[in-house]
């Protein structure tokens, strides 16, 4: 009976809470060897979570699952490695927006820029919806603009989803 309780104990909520905590502290850390060690712990926790979570419970935003599915299904030369690069770029952008919301360069995304074309669009299909989830709006001519204050919680969850998708692409 005790063994049954152990095997059927749902670890997802505990792992998700640990991922939230590790991710938040990771975002607050300065670049250092300790931050790299912390990232390894965070990645390991995400891997454990991904092994037990059904696909519809892996992400905070449905958009994350949509971009991942669309990319794997529709990209002729899809590779998990390259998709991971795209997710990493989105996660880094979100992290920069959280840590430096006053910087004007994070308020506008030119979807024709080298960063967007080579890091995101080349590796993921329809990833602009991740930026829309952060509050960016299309203003025409391939430009996304973030007006008004940054919602740190929303951007944090986009960053976290990007990291979970990054690890998912590596598994």
List each model region and its residues:
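Ubiquitin-system adaptor modules
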Residues: 1-171
